[in-house]
Amino acid sequence: DVLDVFNQNEHKERILLTGRDIEFSFKNSENGMHNFSFNLESGQLVAIMGGSGVGKSTLLSILNGNIIPGEGSVCLNGHPLSDPECKQLIGFVPQDDLLIEELTVFQNLWYTARLCFANLTEKEIEDRVNTILEDLDLSKIRDLAVGSPIRKTISGGQRKRLNIALELIREPAILYLDEPTSGLSSTDSEKVIMLLKEQTHRGRLVVVNIHQPSSEIYKLFDRLWLLDTGGYPIYDGNPIEAITYFKRIANYTDQDISVCGTCGNINPELILTIIDAKKIDDSGNQTNIRKITSKEWHELYVASRPKFQEVKPTPLPPNHQQKPSIWKQFCIFLERNIKTKLTNKQYLCIALLETPLLAVIVALLTRFVPDDGYSLLANKNLVSYIFMAVIVATFTGLSISAEEIIKDRTLLKRERFLRLSRGSYLSSKMFYLLCISAIQSLLFIVVGNLLIGIGSEMFLTWWITLWATSFLANLTGLILSQSLNSIVAIYITI
């Protein structure tokens, strides 16, 4: 509370996030979010708790604008969340890993910063990246490749902090996190939540979806939202007081005790136990019927909820982000894509050796040698060679572009908040594939035509023909990568 007083004086440009009568239901289902209203201010660390499938992630998606509620509204300083200026003040760290595994820790942050701050020089961007690495205790691993979640080169806790850093480098006013402690040890979990607590001291509003917090983590939260089955909010208030609130309704004998008098610990699991308590039948056996249903808990919450007043629009906090031009975005996307490919040695070997090897196989299979010696004009299989060359160009063009977009889907989900040019991203992919297809077509012609005995007179014609065929296959592969939902489905289609 003392810190909050100092923070209010230090951060005069405060934000107010409000929700009024939010209603959302999934198609053919009552699950979603029901009758939820709230006021949140900057400098708060808010926890969303509840059992599995109660709608915690759905609520986060409503708050960050990914899901539009059927009724009600979410506003930032009185401005609707759909306002582009509001979108740029929001940071979202989903549960999925959003790192580019081939790049280093520094490079992941470097390219994100370049896409956010066109008004800064490269030296200023580098200083900003180094500062965030120091703040999040990642400077010692700055030159390590991130690796995949399965084949790790950095720890799980470091990966979580790096995912958070990708959002913090944009300096958002509001930061949402979906299960930031999942899969982490208790020590790493506390480090992550302490990091988020520090962000609230800098004037940010942080909202966290969390499942099973420890006692130490639970006591760090300033505000608690509890959801029950079906998406019903059942509590909004002080985390410590939540335990006595539910004990009192459930008629516990120690309903005034929330903290252990001996060790000072809190048991957050007790809240979920009380909420989900089952009735006992006449034989003393536990039934599957709850003592208090989710709708009854919700009615109690609504009865105790204060009346919210309408908020008049006030100026939004200044936003220091500046998008690069469309051309600059194209260059950054292209550079990032090339850097990613160059660090993947396996990819390079396949991309550069695939077509020469296929050229050798095709040429040897179609090289017809009669008894009186080989002659190109006497080769009965020349038409077959031409046909198979086109098939190879089509196959390599499809295979090399098949994963270009689908593997970036989680990354694009995060960059959606940056409001970058989709055309620049797609153009960078097409230009890269155009170049790699030119190299592959050239290698096939040099090796295959040499073995089959075709002279250099028609070299340019052969190259343009196979290059165009391969590039058309590239475009088809990009369409498949964008349209289909799994890599398996893409390769089956190919």
What residue spans do the PLM features occupy?
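ABC ATPase NBD Q-loop/coupling interface
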Residues: I68, S73-C86
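Catalytic Walker B motif of ABC-type/P-loop ATPase nucleotide-binding domains
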Residues: L175-E179
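Membrane-spanning alpha-helical segments of multipass transporters and channels
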Residues: I234, F246-G264, A277, L342-I494
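ABC ATPase C-loop
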Residues: E167-L168
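Helix-to-loop junction immediately C-terminal to a conserved catalytic motif
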Residues: N64
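Conserved catalytic motifs of ABC-family nucleotide-binding domains
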Residues: E171
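Q-loop/switch helix immediately C-terminal to the Walker
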Residues: D96, E101-A118, R128
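Topological signature of polytopic alpha-helical transporters
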Residues: V2-S37, S42, G51, E71-L76, ...
